[in-house]
Amino acid sequence: MTLQDEIIKELGVKPVIDPKEEIRVSVDFLKDYLKKYPFIKSFVLGISGGQDSSLAGRLAQIAIEEMRQETADETYKFVAIRLPYGVQADEEDAQRALAFIQPDVSLTVNIKAAVEGQVAALNEAGIEVSDFNKGNIKARQRMITQYAVAGQYQGAVLGTDHAAENITGFFTKFGDGGADLLPLFRLNKRQGKALLAELGADPAIYEKVPTADLEEGKPGLADEIALGVTYNDIDDYTEGKVISEDAKAKIEAWWKKTQHKRHLPISVFDDFWK
């Protein structure tokens, strides 16, 4: 078995999907969790305005609505949270996403004060925080906020991790990589687009250039530039297709370099890192 085969098996990506079937798989997955743990009454998710949070958010809202219909329990809610750092340049995209998702509850929590407070405290301790490191603080502050909201709403936090993101480790450890459930896991980028199209999303949502937008010195830096490889190549790779040796080498290098992000904290019983 090649490394590509091993990765595809671990990620669970199918070479061809039926968008309607995959929508049902994700919705049922979320509902099954609520049925298993009846004390959980909400799903919480940060909404950026990009493809991934738009898709996960809409799937969560559908699951919650079906749970209310099936159980007659009106306490089930989906909570969408806008988590801007100051004034976000793509706020229009976020509002477009919220209009598509139609969440039960929509909150906005500006993380700038919390992030700047943390950076100031580190500066006082003699630590000069780099722009890249500060970007990770932003991602982790967003997850702190989501868990705080989930605690108030008896909720579980959803993540937006999917195959194209997971394979490259393109997420912040214990930031956007921290969540309770991952409804998009097994789907690559183009498959996520197909689900959004099936759900009737505005094409602007899934045609938007993907960006983490965490670094102030590189605002709106496209994921593909940061990774040095295109999502088209990543998607082809996860579907078992042949891609250029250069792209393949980059993808597999990212996979190996970021293995620690795909595991719980390492103990003496773990050997994946050796």
UniProtKB/Swiss-Prot annotation:
It catalyses: deamido-NAD(+) + NH4(+) + ATP = AMP + diphosphate + NAD(+) + H(+). Its EC number is 6.3.1.5. Signal peptide: none annotated. It comes from the Bacteria. One of its GO terms (cellular component) is cytoplasm. Deamido-NAD(+) binds at R140, K173, D180, H260, K261. Keywords: ATP-binding, Ligase, Magnesium, Metal-binding, NAD, Nucleotide-binding. Catalyzes the ATP-dependent amidation of deamido-NAD to form NAD. Uses ammonia as a nitrogen source. Homodimer. PANTHER family: NH 3 /GLUTAMINE-DEPENDENT NAD + SYNTHETASE, NH(3)-DEPENDENT NAD(+) SYNTHETASE. This is NH(3)-dependent NAD(+) synthetase. It comes from Lactococcus lactis subsp. lactis (strain IL1403). The gene is nadE.
